[in-house]
Amino acid sequence: MRLGLVIEGGGMKCAYSSGILDMMMDDGIKPDYVIGVSAGAACGASFVAGQRDRNRRFFVDYVERPEYMGWTAFFRSKGNFFNLEYIYQDMTGAGGEDALDYDAIMKNPCELWAVATDAETGKPYYFNKSDLHPYDYSVYMATCAIPIACRPVKINGHLYFDGGCSDSVPVRRALEAGCDKVIVILCRTKDTVREPEKHQRLYRTLLRRYPKMIHNLDVRHEKYNRTLNAIRKLEEKGHALIIAPEKQLEITTYTRDPKELQKLYDTAIREYPHIRERLLTFCEDHIE
């Protein structure tokens, strides 16, 4: 039985996901396949590396630094509201202040994937851990490059934006990879109905060089709602288990308040016992 783990993106809302992942680490849950989107992909990397509390530190301890995000970061990084180079190169790379354990990821037999969106084609591109380098985590810069808030990231001659623009919750990809069961971590309630993107005039102007990206954002809510409906049906059949906030989060993608982000992390810790028994039964063959 092959077990997958899918982690939705959501910027700072993924502080919730980080709490869930820490509790899963404590319970010794070991999936065969992990795929994440945007901040969810970065959270998945720390999970596969076995670095408990690392994700929380990035959401809570470092968030107020001017280099991290905000207008200071925007001007220092020449156009990124999230200073992706600071987060995923300076901090995360080998020798960085809170480096990702590259060796642990490579030694772990678990597959690790991150979704980005090709800026020219608008299609998802799936990076795996063979694309990582201890001194270069451009993959995570790419999957987190939110349109408008960030410039696209170039990898091997191609430009990429946030993976959520093309495959927000990549459960189908996990199933195609041979997963029999999939744990899905959301940072929205499981009954969420996503609305059309706001600021359409703004993104249509700023992304005019990337018409496929504009189309993706125009229809993103429709695709997301279809995907979530399909996942709920998989859960009814016993092929998926959804872990999601019990109430809609007040945190936004761009929240910088460390107290609020710590509360969100703590919310995940508090809610985890409500799903724990079902989760342990669901993945009973993948617990060490």
List where the protein language model places each region.
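Patatin-like phospholipase
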Residues: 1-37, 45-288
